[in-house]
Amino acid sequence: MGQKVHPRGFRLGLSADWQAKWFNEKNYKEWLLEDEEIRKIIKNKYYHAGISEIYIERPDAERVNITVKTARPGIIIGRKGAEITSLREELEKRFNRRMVINIEEIKTPELDAQLVAESIASRIEKRASYKVAMKRAIMNAMRKGAQGIKVMVAGRLGGAEIARREWYLRGRLPLQKIKAIIDYGTAVAWTKYGTIGVKVWIYKGDADI
């Protein structure tokens, strides 16, 4: 049976970066759980902001640097920065640490695998055809310059009695090539027939390593 490796974990330190940039042997468990809670709070509060990734750095025990990659920075920043100030104060009060929040705009969300997966899942939840949603995502990604894209959905597709999976591939997707820049994202669509999983791989070219 073939063994599969996570596309991001396979390339960490080369064409992919760590989402948590810190190490502390003494407080490792506490900080790891904090990181997950911080990500959950931000993702849930700004679900419609198109958040792809949240990077967390800890220069010392009292400060946390958070970088949010989003397709709609205005939703998180708010008018005159009111929303981001409110978020920072909420996190500082909850975790009793100084929070520094940076926002990075995603210029081409069509090439962000996580946002593409969430977009497909959202369309499926709204009872759109999963085939149309998949093909539209592929077409948009290729139009924006992707060298390859694969989209897979699994579950009771179209309300079928038996769960199955379907996938579409356009272009190239060299998963075993370490210097290949491959973005990977997953999402879940909640339907009345159960959950439908969505996975997206986008090949953007090769890194200079």
From Swiss-Prot:
GO molecular function, one term: rRNA binding
One GO term describing the cellular component: cytosolic small ribosomal subunit
Residue ranges annotated for the KH type-2 domain, each copy included: 38-107
One BP term from GO: translation
Alphabetical list of InterPro entries matching this protein: KH_dom, KH_dom-like_a/b, KH_dom_type_2, KH_sf_prok-type, Ribosomal_S3_C_sf, Ribosomal_uS3_bac-typ, Ribosomal_uS3_C, Ribosomal_uS3_CS
UniProt signal peptide: none
Pfam families found in the cross-reference section: KH_2, Ribosomal_S3_C
Gene3D superfamilies xref list: 3.30.300.20, Ribosomal protein S3, C-terminal domain
Keyword Ribosomal protein in record: yes
Keywords assigned: Ribonucleoprotein, Ribosomal protein, RNA-binding, rRNA-binding
Transmembrane domains' residue ranges: none
Family according to the record: Belongs to the universal ribosomal protein uS3 family.
Role noted for this protein: Binds the lower part of the 30S subunit head. Binds mRNA in the 70S ribosome, positioning it for translation.
Subunit annotation: Part of the 30S ribosomal subunit. Forms a tight complex with proteins S10 and S14.
Annotated protein name in UniProt: Small ribosomal subunit protein uS3
Gene field: rpsC
